[in-house]
Regions:
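Cytosolic-side transmembrane-helix boundaries in multi-pass membrane proteins
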Residues: 1-31, 152, 192-221, 226, ...
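Membrane-helix/interface signature in polytopic inner-membrane proteins
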Residues: 197-211, 252-292
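Transmembrane alpha-helical segments in multi-pass inner-membrane proteins
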Residues: 292-305, 309-372
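Transmembrane helix-bundle core of multi-pass membrane transporters
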Residues: 140-258
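Loop-to-transmembrane alpha-helix initiation sites
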Residues: 53, 129, 158, 176-186, ...
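Alpha-helical transmembrane segments within multi-pass membrane transporters and channels
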Residues: 97-138, 348
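Inter-helical junctions in multi-pass inner-membrane proteins, predominant
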Residues: 39-49, 149, 231-244, 255-259, ...
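Single transmembrane alpha-helix segments in multi-pass membrane proteins
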Residues: 31-35, 39-96, 120-127, 276, ...
Length: 393
């Protein structure tokens, strides 16, 4: 009896270690760089900088996840779309002096149209996504250069820059501490705990699979603790960055879509077995079309955010961004074969890459070695996925 319980505990621990391996790796990397940077990595100002620097990666990675879920497909055009939308925003706002909010709406609409263009060729003409998005990468890079004519446009007005470089004000006059930020963190942590408890009660009543209890306890303690630590750290600087609100909305909305909606289930079904999904009545063409339309929409959001952070529209903006997004997805647990991956995992993957980049920069590691390290990390992450599936089979 005792042997059986020990075996069950070992099995449960092993499953949870596999499930939370990237979270454990992220914590380990943060501790390593916190020590090697002489406790500079997690100072309040640098944490704010990490959020500003990696906002575009998180936005793009969430969209890329939906493409990967459809069967391991990727979108190579997102970096060029980011650059093109930034150039379009610069042309409208700086050159043509158009209203900032109208310009933002036009840029987002342009992103949707670009996604529909890609989605049409992929879903209805059935050209492989790799080819379509490769042509998109070249096409929109060229359009960026044409729009900017090789020049960098600046500066953007303050009303636009605040979207990516501003902070929310404090409602309380506490010196050197943003109490509003701390209260928001406490409320977010409490809401998370309540939602997790009610979700587990609902699953138990319906006799659904609840997962391992150890994992549940770890999640309900660790994630609120992380939220509170981040809130406290930001409160010691300038408070909540405005871009953090954009990220929170995107992450929460897409986590809900992928976990709680029919559209989300269709994505996982398509990635699991496209033929079976089609035979079961799922409109696979529509799923592909919407996944790639959504990807370019989020690329437009990332383009607006990045242009605001850069405070200019530059011809080189967006270069290599698709690799950061793809890397964040695979490091965060998305399967190279499709059908597996979560928004939470992608968020961890994006933060992991951000901490890795920032930590190596502070330590003084050159950009050449940084690329080598990131390449090896991505390779090992995908290899871990492949080996895990082989063992399961």
């Amino acid at each position: 009896m005792e042997e059986s319980k020990l075996k069950q505990f070992t099995s449960s621990l092993s499953a949870n270690l596999q499930q939370y391996s990237m979270l454990i790796a992220l914590i380990a990397v943060m501790i390593f760089f916190e020590i090697t940077t002489k406790f500079v990595l997690l100072v309040p100002q640098n944490v704010s900088n990490l959020i500003f620097q990696n906002a575009y990666v998180i936005i793009l990675a969430v969209g890329m996840l939906l493409c990967i879920l459809t069967g391991g497909n990727i979108d190579l055009s997102v970096g060029s779309v980011v650059g093109f939308i930034g150039a379009l925003a610069g042309q409208l706002i700086i050159v043509n002096k158009m209203n900032v909010y109208l310009s933002i709406v036009i840029c987002l609409a342009a992103g949707i149209l670009i996604g529909m263009w890609h989605g049409f060729w992929i879903a209805y003409v059935q050209i492989p996504p790799f080819i379509v998005t490769l042509t998109g990468m070249l096409l929109f890079k060229g359009l960026t250069l044409v729009t900017l004519q090789g020049l960098t446009l600046s500066p953007f007005p303050d009303s636009y820059l605040g979207m990516s470089t501003g902070f929310f004000g404090d409602f309380f006059a506490v010196p050197n501490f943003n109490l509003t930020c701390m209260l928001v963190g406490v409320i977010a942590a409490v809401i998370f705990i309540i939602m997790q408890i009610f979700s587990r009660i609902h699953k138990v009543r319906k006799r659904y699979e609840t997962g391992h209890f150890i994992g549940y306890i770890v999640k309900i303690i660790l994630i609120p603790a992380v939220i509170l630590v981040i809130a406290y750290t930001l409160a010691r600087y300038k408070g909540i960055p405005t871009v953090l609100l954009i990220l929170a909305i995107i992450v929460l909305v897409y986590a809900y879509i992928t976990n709680k909606t029919v559209a989300g289930r269709y994505l996982y079904a398509l990635g699991g077995n496209q033929k079976a999904a089609r035979l079961s009545g799922i409109n696979t063409k529509k799923v592909f079309f919407l996944a790639y339309t959504n990807m370019s929409f989020l690329a437009a959001v990332a383009g607006l955010v990045f242009a605001a952070r850069l405070q200019s529209a530059a011809p080189t903006a967006g270069d290599g961004f698709e690799l950061d997004a793809i890397g964040a997805c695979f490091i965060g647990g998305a399967s190279a074969y499709g059908g597996i991956g979560t928004v939470g995992g992608v968020l961890i993957g994006a933060i992991f890459m951000g901490v890795l980049n920032n930590g190596m920069s502070i330590v003084g590691i050159g950009s050449d070695w940084q690329k080598i390290v990131k390449g090896l990390v991505l390779l090992f992450a995908v290899a871990f996925d492949v080996v895990s599936k082989r063992k399961t089979k």
